[in-house]
Amino acid sequence: MTGPLSTRVATLCNQIVAEVGPDAAGQVERIGERLGEPLRVAIAGRLKAGKSTLVNALIGRRVAPTAVGECTRVVTRFRYGPADRVDVVRRDGSRRSLPLDDQGMIPQRLGVHLSRVAYVDVTLTSEKLRELTVVDTPGLASTDAGVSARAEAAVGASPVPAGTAPFDADIDADSASEVAAAEAVVYVFTQAVRADDVRALEAFRHTSARLASSPINALGVLAKADTLVGGADDPWPVAGPLAQQQGTLLARTVSDVVPVIGLLAETGEAGRLTSADADALKQLAATGNLQVLLASVDLFRGAPGPVGADRRERLLSLLDLYGIGFAIAQLSAEPRLGTGELVRRLVLASGFPRLQHTLEQTFRWRSDAIKAGWALARLDRLAGHTQDPRTREALRDAVEQLLREPDYHRLRLLDVAQRVATGAVALPADWEQELTRLATSEDARWILRLPDAGPAELADAALRAAHRWRAYAVAGAGPAQSRVAQVAHRGFYLLSQRVRG
């Protein structure tokens, strides 16, 4: 789905193709085409952090292998297509097509030496990929220097001295170009955030010219939340507060930290739990030794009971102990509960819906402005490089005319919000929070913290905020703060006009 800002820029591209020279026309067309592509989300994190499991949940199919293999050592792009297809894209641009394996997953062996692989391009018929392209990156801080190099390249990291970052210093530019187009970044970690986790996130932010690498469009995921406690115990009393602590620690790097039980999310979203699995869980629910059965993985495997060893092993692979305990509790309370409803509750218990909401509502809304700003910057850059005066003037006139439209003030708001969010410009905490709300939402009630206000009250509140920012720009700010405040002033003034109608 293309938003109104990027749609307008795409229309502009179509209009000016006929006004520019032939050399520039192809580039303008490509910029316009890129605006129509789905939101790109790059998934990054340590090896075995749960990235591929999360990718499968986002896609709605178990297609990304979770065991370490060749395909987990390269950048993999998942996008929508009319047929399932796997292409290994070499650095020279050539492709080698592969079928999915017997389990419907990417083959573990790619048939191309890893040093020659730029990325793996996977097209799937999954409906979830119609509006979302997922880019899975290799594990960061790998003990394998080659894998770490590809991970560094995937996040666009600059070379750094050995031992000072979680990457090898070698950079794969082909892989870097794949992730550079992402509108959002999801960084996956487990339990405590380590110093090099923070440095890895900083690599996204400092080496990209795109707003996607700022806290505005970066999200942390505390994966494997069920492993924070033992056995089948409820992890959420621990996972929730821990995610809040991590969010505070990473406030300059990510917009939020969301705890997720990735295995439950993958099992539910990919439709892996069958009626036979549900029947086995019902049999277990009817036994009298649940406390022993769920005390540990070994006891679950070996304790006497009506369900065979193979089925128990499968349940562990689908749900692990917490998921099994949760499912049994649901079935004990409602023995006639259907498989579909059980799956729905498992997904809710995974915490995945909150992550989906953030990606779909927050990142997707922001990505409209991100894409529009990227396209306008590319058009302006093209104007600066062309040798044809007619082309140069046509491009610059079109960009300047569009930027004068009030709707495009959002681009400037996102730009200054990024500077403040990364600490480049310091603002008082409450001012920073207000600016972030203004830059990242269209909901006037949420921006102004007036959930029950009508249009007139909202308009007056927005105007007061505009005056407050104007006064701060004139009297209470340094030069950098003043520039930010001027942008915020105009943003609130435009908001007051919009809500007043």
Q: Which residue stretches match the model-derived regions?
A:
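Secondary-structure edge/capping motif, primarily at the C-terminal ends of alpha-helices
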Residues: 16, 335, 362, 366, ...
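Charged, amphipathic alpha-helical linker segments immediately N-terminal to NTP-binding catalytic cores
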Residues: 1-22
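C-terminal end of P-loop GTPase domains and the immediately downstream helical coupling element
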Residues: 213-215, 219, 225-233, 237-411
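Active-site-adjacent bridging/hinge elements
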Residues: 50, 326-334, 437, 461-468
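N-terminal J-domain/J-like co-chaperone modules of DnaJ/Hsp40 proteins
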Residues: 409-501
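Globular "head" domains of long coiled-coil molecular machines
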Residues: 32, 36-294, 349
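Charge-rich, solvent-exposed alpha-helical interaction surfaces
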Residues: 8, 12-15, 27, 358, ...
